[in-house]
Design a protein with these regions (language model features):
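Residue-level preference for the first positions of well-ordered beta-strands
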Residues: 100-102, 136, 184
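Conserved P-loop NTPase nucleotide-binding/switch module
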Residues: 180-201
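Glycine-rich phosphate-binding P-loop
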Residues: 98-120
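Conserved nucleotide-binding/hydrolysis micro-motifs of P-loop NTPases
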Residues: 48, 56-57, 78-80, 99-101, ...
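P-loop NTPase switch/communication element
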Residues: 123-174
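P-loop NTP-binding catalytic core
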Residues: 29-97
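N-terminal accessory targeting/assembly segments
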Residues: 1-45
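Conserved RecA-like P-loop NTPase ATPase core
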Residues: 51, 140, 185
Length: 201
């Protein structure tokens, strides 16, 4: 809940946190180890649970999290057609193509929600403006766009969309270009020099 704090008179202990985590991981925390090392897991429905604790480092990489201290539940929701207002700005109707587009806003304002719906509309096509659907490739590095669960997108990202997740943007873009020949590539959270270089290529 972004706009209000709800405080209850109950102190959760570490044993209870681990029990909750085990249930979220279907009693197989090991199967979710890679996601846990990234600080979150994605569960069925596309909901995301942030995890904090003590990082175990090896060769400058996080190989585990121990002493889990907090869980932060982010309830996923789709807002269909929220991209309607911007589609006219990013579509070249004459050539039936997409302009290079960057969505920018402060945290928590709906960038990912807007991006997801934009991908869906571009992928499906928009008959009302005679826009034919495009093959889309999504690099879902943190699993927030398509919210894949056991290989199945939990969010509607369109009928012509291929998704690769849990991979860096640079590697994911190369993979999609080499194997899927997308007409449009989308990704979320451009935050590093490597991300910028991958896009510029």
């Amino acid at each position: 809940i972004r706009q209000a704090d709800i405080v209850i008179d109950y102190k959760v202990n570490q044993k209870e946190i681990l029990q909750i985590l085990e249930k979220l991981c279907n009693s197989s925390i090991y199967a979710y180890k890679n996601q846990i090392c990234e600080g979150f897991i994605t569960v069925k429905g596309g909901h995301r649970v942030g995890i904090t604790g003590t990082a175990v480092i090896e060769n400058e990489r996080i190989i585990n999290l121990k002493y889990i201290t907090s869980l932060n539940f982010r309830i996923a929701r789709e807002v269909l057609n929220c991209s309607n207002k911007i589609l006219g700005q990013i579509i070249d109707k004459e050539s039936n193509s997409i302009y290079t587009t960057l969505i920018v806003s402060p945290p928590g304002m709906g960038k990912t929600t807007m991006l997801r719906d934009t991908i869906r509309r571009i992928s499906n096509g928009i008959p009302e403006i005679n826009f034919k659907g495009k093959t889309c490739g999504v690099v879902d590095e943190r699993g927030e766009i398509a919210a894949m669960y056991q290989g199945i997108p939990q969010n509607d990202v369109g009928i012509r969309t291929d998704v690769v997740e849990n991979i860096s943007k640079a590697k994911g873009m190369k993979m999609l270009i080499r194997s899927m020949a997308p007409e449009v590539i989308a990704c979320d959270e451009i935050g590093s020099k490597e991300d910028v270089e991958a896009i510029r290529r």
